[in-house]
């Protein structure tokens, strides 16, 4: 099944050119299927690029996904046209009484600030608490993952002396995890951040499990079953040229490690993480499908395995 997004969202023609099946609203109405409702709280400055990256991954599974774009209620986006925000994004205050099968919260370029000094921190805390009563499963990315670890578990973030920047080899620490089904032993994942969380700070007894880590950049992906969340500190969703664009945008500082062939920025980078990005989001969507209530109104009242038909292949068979 395809992803259902607004007919005139800029991501649509890009995804269609890539072969992602994008459903028009009129077609979706004719299918007697309850789509998985996925919300995307987009905190990134370039919202159009980010929504395209994530829609690409969410739309690549056999299940029909209905994507709702969400923004912070009072925060005004400065890098995305106001007409785009008005046309495609709903403030969180408007959706807070609704329920979602999945909810993605992106990173934001505010790592240098203490959490409490971020202008929308109080509302983000309310959003995180709301996911525990109105969302079946959450997926936080980069700064949002650091924020969730701090909010739910008191885990601090640590500023780095230099930006962790590049394409780094990671270790698969939990090959039996349903979220890492199909993963290789050493996936490469893009990293771009000025702060980190440390394995030593993860509280004993928290139930947090580190699924992926890197010897160079630390924890990458944590499973948080107590809060029905995955926390991804890096950027598996990035486009092939995302790190290159950051490098040239920032005045050509240190090269992104392990990214340009031969460390030559004149040579086009190769995408060595796309397959794992699709696997991770596909596995997450599959776990949502297997465990979310068929009646979306029941989300928040438990986690009954209403659709426990096994992996997507069995469900779609």
UniProtKB/Swiss-Prot annotation:
Alphabetical keyword list: Acyltransferase, Amino-acid biosynthesis, Cytoplasm, Methionine biosynthesis, Transferase
Main subcellular localisation: cytoplasm
Enzyme class: transferase
Gene Ontology annotations for the cellular component aspect, listed alphabetically: cytoplasm
Metabolic or biological pathway: Amino-acid biosynthesis; L-methionine biosynthesis via de novo pathway; O-acetyl-L-homoserine from L-homoserine: step 1/1
Entries under Pfam families matching the protein: HTS
Catalytic activity: L-homoserine + acetyl-CoA = O-acetyl-L-homoserine + CoA
Active-site residues, record numbering mapped to chain: 142, 235, 237
Similarity field: Belongs to the MetA family.
Function: Transfers an acetyl group from acetyl-CoA to L-homoserine, forming acetyl-L-homoserine.
Protein name: Homoserine O-acetyltransferase
The gene coding this protein: metAA
